[in-house]
């Protein structure tokens, strides 16, 4: 079988792919790039040239508090969808009626409004498209190319340099709608559309 139709899993994890990201700019919705910068990250828009450093989270997150009331020591628990930089929740004790703001633990989510986001700013990924109830996505163009090679291969092999446990590898965790041979042509067409995406 020709190498064109074979794919040997290089042992890549999703974490290995999280080196940079292509996202929608929070200012103009154009294409923006998130790259490592001075031991942190920087987002730069290719359309409006907006530049931003980490600080604001644009995606979904949950604020969660589980504490004992400061007055009567009754257990208090609350969880709400949060936005921006929330870090406190106002709570009223059902037992003694005391009201107070408590420090909340913030849990950031990788999905916002049904679409995937980057793990740095929570911005919607540029390279994604809904497929039925699912979403096909990639962090950046190199990630998209690897997915294209995998989808296009008729023979998919576990590579010899495979360094991780089988279930931690990116290709072993792909959803069925991507891995199913019957969806190959549809997926390749979708990947080509994403490669050509301008707006």
How would you name each of these model-derived features?
Residues 1-81:
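N-terminal cysteine/histidine-rich coordination modules
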Residues 8-16, 60, 79-88, 95-98, ...:
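A composition-biased, non-transmembrane "mature-region" signal
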Residues 21-23, 90, 154:
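Core catalytic machinery and nucleic-acid-binding channels of phosphodiester-processing enzymes
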Residues 38-52, 70, 86-99, 117-119:
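Cysteine-rich micro-motifs
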Residues 67-94, 98, 135-143:
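Conserved small-residue-rich
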Residues 118-162, 169-178:
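Amphipathic alpha-helical packing elements
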Residues 165-199:
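C-terminal, charged low-complexity interaction regions
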